UniProtKB/Swiss-Prot annotation:
One of its GO terms (molecular function) is ATP binding. Its EC number is 6.3.4.13. It comes from the Bacteria. The gene is purD. This is Phosphoribosylamine--glycine ligase. InterPro entries: ATP-grasp, ATP_grasp_subdomain_1, PreATP-grasp_dom_sf, PRibGlycinamid_synth_ATP-grasp, PRibGlycinamide_synth, PRibGlycinamide_synth_C-dom, PRibGlycinamide_synth_C_sf, PRibGlycinamide_synth_CS. Pfam families: GARS_A, GARS_C, GARS_N. It comes from Pseudomonas putida (strain ATCC 47054 / DSM 6125 / CFBP 8728 / NCIMB 11950 / KT2440). It catalyses: 5-phospho-beta-D-ribosylamine + glycine + ATP = N(1)-(5-phospho-beta-D-ribosyl)glycinamide + ADP + phosphate + H(+).
Length: 431
């Protein structure tokens, strides 16, 4: 069989790599893909943009049996609706269901309607009422641009001045284009974050392995937010008890609530959670797709065929399958271009990939391109060095062995990915 993966990031390289491992799969097309998917066994890039929906559907109709969507942008504009209208299997939520990620305001209102735990909040489109609300609530406080801002439209303001500047920026300056024309202001939640990703077939839910990502650009969680600088799986904060609470209080009410409201949810559903000291989960955000970089360590641990699981979802039979996981933890370190998440250079030649390929683990490509037979940088997050180990500390050590082999002009990475889990292993408890 043949499969199409839509996207060009590290997440899509990991999905394509995993799908290609199924012996029934002869070919994995990736649109538009990156240098990693260009050279991955069984994989081939297709030069179609992720938002060129008609072209994607035309290609899928002629060439593939099923499609898996990586990024949020095509989902929010209705790629699944179009594929379905043409009788094509496409794993992901419809445009209506993808509002869970496409609009922060839709999501907060949905959570309130269904009594799903989340931070207190209010939506604003005008500066004055927003500033008055800030005065009333004080800092720390969280300001979010309403639409898609590539994971960067969230400001955790530790002072009122910072909060007011963020509101002015998003509403008056419209720093995030269209996405910022409405803001959500919400209470600051204390605790530990976890990424809880499940597969949904409309009615049944199959949990994936838990993970924790590191959003801040600098060590010890300093500096601005990014799309994610590294991740590991599983997330020890999600104990068996917390897992049950998340399913009962967050995932099931969300899937049922969406169905009741006429937006039956299919695809990957990612709940970004804050877990407090008592183990109570609150929803920070939903994403309507697998996380990036969480996909990379999670796929490394998945022993089952991803294709089989997706087929079960199309058959509305996710309750009949189980996902098998390697019990060992895995950890991925993102290698980024100098200047990220701000402005960065593209087109630098990447050195050391051949040496890294000889070391245990896997270097997934994100912002890379093939130019004259050389792999060059083509984005802010460029690679993700991913490895497993008997402990998180071992997995971390192995991932950094990989990361150290690879470099280009201005490359950098965080040196402490997984620090919370490693502190737990050593018996130091950190919040």
């Amino acid at each position: 069989m043949k499969v199409l993966i839509i996207g060009s990031g590290g997440r899509e390289h990991a999905l394509a790599w995993k799908v290609a491992q199924d012996p029934r799969v002869e070919k994995v097309f990736v649109a538009p893909g990156n240098a990693g998917t260009a050279i991955e066994a069984k994989c081939e890039n297709v030069a179609i943009d992720v938002c060129a929906l008609e072209q994607l559907a035309d290609f899928a109709e002629k060439n593939v049996d099923l499609t898996i969507v990586g990024p949020e942008a095509p989902l929010v504009i209705g790629v699944v609706d179009l594929f379905r209208s043409r009788g094509l299997d496409c794993f992901g939520p419809t445009k209506g269901a993808a509002q869970l990620e496409g609009s922060k305001a839709f999501t907060k209102d949905f959570l309130a309607r269904h009594e799903i735990p989340t931070a207190d909040y209010q939506n604003f489109t005008e500066i004055e009422p927003a500033l008055a609300y800030l005065q009333e609530k004080g800092a720390p406080i969280v300001i979010k641009a309403d639409g898609l801002a590539a994971g960067k439209g969230v400001i955790v303001a530790m002072t009122l001045e910072e909060a007011e500047a963020a509101v002015r920026d998003m509403l008056a300056g419209n720093a995030f284009g269209e996405a910022g024309s409405r803001v959500v202001i919400e209470e600051f939640l204390d605790g530990e974050e976890a990424s809880f990703i499940v597969m949904v077939d409309g009615h049944n839910v199959l949990p994936m392995a838990t993970s924790q990502d590191h959003k801040r650009v600098g060590d010890q969680d300093t500096g601005p937010n990014t799309g994610g600088m590294g991740a590991y799986s599983p997330a020890p904060v999600v104990t068996a008890d917390v897992h049950q609470r998340v399913m009962d209080q967050v995932i099931w009410p969300t899937v049922r609530g969406m169905a009741e409201e006429g937006n039956v949810y299919t695809g990957f559903l990612y709940a970004g959670l804050m877990i407090d000291k008592a183990g109570n989960p609150k929803v920070i955000e939903f994403n309507c797709r697998f996380g990036d970089p969480e996909t990379q360590p999670v796929m490394l641990r998945l022993e089952s065929s991803l294709v089989l699981l997706v087929e079960a979802a199309f058959a509305k039979a996710l309750d009949k399958v189980e996902a098998q996981w390697d019990p060992r933890p895995s950890l991925g370190v993102v290698l980024a271009a100098g200047g990220y998440p701000g402005d960065y250079a593209k087109g630098d030649v990447i050195n050391g990939l051949d040496a890294a390929a000889k070391i245990e683990g896997k270097v997934f490509h994100a912002g890379t391109a093939l130019k004259d037979g050389k792999v060059t940088t083509n984005g802010g997050r460029v690679l993700c060095a991913t490895a497993m180990g008997s402990t998180v500390a071992d997995a971390q050590q192995q991932a950094y062995r990989l990361a150290k082999e690879v470099s280009w002009n201005g490359s950098f990475y965080r040196s402490d990915i997984g620090y919370r889990a490693i502190a737990r292993e050593r018996g130091e408890h950190q919040q």
